[in-house]
Amino acid sequence: MDVTRNTAVIVVPNRLDFAEALEHLQRVVYNGSKEDHHPDALHAEHFRSQVTIFPEGQFVAIDPHTGLIVGHTSSMLLHYTPGQPFTQPWVVTTDYGRLTPHDPLGDWMYGVESAVLPDYQGRGVGSALYAARFALAQQLNLRGMIAGSTIMNYHQYVDRMTPDEYVSAVVTGLVYDNNLTKQLRKGFRVLNVIPDYVSDELSCGYGAAILWDNPAYDPSQPSPLPSAA
């Protein structure tokens, strides 16, 4: 059953047999910048681990006309204390994308990864995948979603701005960032800058911790996730 639709894609739960296609998608999206030895690279084994550990949090976007997987998003659950900085590198939080730190009793969703094929970017695919994430957060009565946003355009400003200055400029709209700006428009807010967040030249390794509050969160109600019962 499809979770959500837009004019371009159908978003459905990820499956074990999609793993090889998703590994290929990652290689295309990152255009060789994440080779096999790269610490942030996701392989078929990682996607199988994600589906096995937390199937509810994994989604793919499929072109209904061709059957091609054109995007995906991965998430896990964890505990987070609001108001505290979030500074963990991506590889630590996610165990290199395997999701073994996933906590079924976690009250926050953590955004592990989201990627869309270049030919499908700008067509609402990313928004459809985020909509699936937000819907799941509301279904599970989570407090919200936290993630690290790789600041993809920082390399263009590294000689002029510190990471904190750059993120502040993105937040105020003075600078456009290919990643963070889009997430701010989806309702996220910035918590802090994360040094050594990822191994990435474009961001110089920096990320911004971002948070989305679930407007439907009801603290008097438990999460309905079966594994959290």
Where are these predicted regions, by residue range?
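Short, cationic low-complexity segments
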Residues: P224-A229
